[in-house]
Amino acid sequence: MTPLFRKAVWLLFAVSVCAFAGSLAAQYVLGMEPCVLCISQRLCVLATALCTAIVLMCRPRRRAGGLFGAVFISIPAVTGISVAAYQLWLQSLPPGTAPSCGAPWTFRLKGWSLFDWFEPVVRGFGNCAEPDYLLGVALPVWSAAYFLAVVLTVWWAWARAK
């Protein structure tokens, strides 16, 4: 792994951890109630952080290893972009016409053996069609911007690494 690619992955790891902490702070400090799609995006942020950590621990030595790392990091980020885009579409619908976004994660994972440990991460009962704003911008837009930045950064670093 070239120094540039490694630095970029370290940066993505740090930003991902901060984004995950920010999502928890928005819920537990600011009192925002996340919906099912918000929690799905939070899990994609956590998966992105875990993927960057795995790539950093594996230390691929060849360009093909860097390619694997870029693809591995991009998978949860692209998933997060698609979830954010779906939530933005739901929020663009006229009030009362948006479909339900599904059962809460706490209901879905209740029988899971690690539920008690993981429950604070997936707790939330907000409405997916009701937008919450941060600095005047809807939260799914911030989420999509973060995921897009992850994808662009990892592929830029891979392309520049020679």
UniProtKB/Swiss-Prot annotation:
<keyword id="KW-1133">Transmembrane helix</keyword>
<dbReference type="InterPro" id="IPR023380">
    <property type="entry name" value="DsbB-like_sf"/>
</dbReference>
<protein>
    <recommendedName>
        <fullName>Disulfide bond formation protein B</fullName>
    </recommendedName>
</protein>
<dbReference type="GO" id="GO:0006457">
    <property type="term" value="P:protein folding"/>
</dbReference>
<dbReference type="GO" id="GO:0009055">
    <property type="term" value="F:electron transfer activity"/>
</dbReference>
<keyword id="KW-1015">Disulfide bond</keyword>
<keyword id="KW-0676">Redox-active center</keyword>
<keyword id="KW-0997">Cell inner membrane</keyword>
<dbReference type="InterPro" id="IPR003752">
    <property type="entry name" value="DiS_bond_form_DsbB/BdbC"/>
</dbReference>
<keyword id="KW-0812">Transmembrane</keyword>
<feature type="transmembrane region" description="Helical">
    <location>
        <begin position="9"/>
        <end position="25"/>
    </location>
</feature>
<feature type="topological domain" description="Periplasmic">
    <location>
        <begin position="86"/>
        <end position="141"/>
    </location>
</feature>
<keyword id="KW-0472">Membrane</keyword>
<feature type="transmembrane region" description="Helical">
    <location>
        <begin position="44"/>
        <end position="60"/>
    </location>
</feature>
<feature type="topological domain" description="Cytoplasmic">
    <location>
        <begin position="161"/>
        <end position="162"/>
    </location>
</feature>
<keyword id="KW-1003">Cell membrane</keyword>
<feature type="transmembrane region" description="Helical">
    <location>
        <begin position="68"/>
        <end position="85"/>
    </location>
</feature>
<feature type="disulfide bond" description="Redox-active">
    <location>
        <begin position="35"/>
        <end position="38"/>
    </location>
</feature>
<feature type="topological domain" description="Cytoplasmic">
    <location>
        <begin position="61"/>
        <end position="67"/>
    </location>
</feature>
<feature type="disulfide bond" description="Redox-active">
    <location>
        <begin position="101"/>
        <end position="128"/>
    </location>
</feature>
<keyword id="KW-0560">Oxidoreductase</keyword>
<dbReference type="InterPro" id="IPR050183">
    <property type="entry name" value="DsbB"/>
</dbReference>
<dbReference type="GO" id="GO:0015035">
    <property type="term" value="F:protein-disulfide reductase activity"/>
</dbReference>
<keyword id="KW-0143">Chaperone</keyword>
<comment type="function">
    <text>Required for disulfide bond formation in some periplasmic proteins. Acts by oxidizing the DsbA protein.</text>
</comment>
<dbReference type="InterPro" id="IPR022920">
    <property type="entry name" value="Disulphide_bond_form_DsbB"/>
</dbReference>
<dbReference type="GO" id="GO:0005886">
    <property type="term" value="C:plasma membrane"/>
</dbReference>
<dbReference type="Pfam" id="PF02600">
    <property type="entry name" value="DsbB"/>
</dbReference>
<feature type="topological domain" description="Cytoplasmic">
    <location>
        <begin position="1"/>
        <end position="8"/>
    </location>
</feature>
<keyword id="KW-0813">Transport</keyword>
<comment type="similarity">
    <text>Belongs to the DsbB family.</text>
</comment>
<feature type="topological domain" description="Periplasmic">
    <location>
        <begin position="26"/>
        <end position="43"/>
    </location>
</feature>
<feature type="transmembrane region" description="Helical">
    <location>
        <begin position="142"/>
        <end position="160"/>
    </location>
</feature>
<keyword id="KW-0249">Electron transport</keyword>
